[in-house]
Regions:
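Surface-exposed loop/turn positions within long extracellular repeat scaffolds
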Residues: 1-56, 66-87
Length: 87
């Protein structure tokens, strides 16, 4: 199961990913709250992703642009760079 969020969101609550893949194609797609990722978070975008990422899931960087993860990240599932640059 895959859900793609492409617009900018302004909610401040957290995001919980418990199964499948959540694809964010905009650095503002997940609002400003913490992300608890226990499945797969795919960031198909460039820019500065400032949300904190925790949980046991994997983070995937896709898309051609450069992406910075500047939040306080504690996720343990590893990072896969399928395309683009992670800085």
């Amino acid at each position: 199961k895959t859900l793609t969020l492409s617009g900018s969101n302004t909610y401040t609550g957290g995001t919980l990913i418990s199964d499948g893949t959540l694809v964010a194609s905009n650095v503002e797609s997940l609002g400003t709250g913490d992300v608890t990722n226990n499945a797969t978070l795919e960031l198909n975008t460039g820019g500065d992703f400032t949300n904190n990422i925790g949980g046991s899931g994997q983070v995937v960087k896709s898309g051609d642009d450069a992406l910075a993860l500047s939040g306080a990240n504690s996720y343990t599932g590893g990072t896969l760079i399928s395309s683009g640059t992670l800085v």
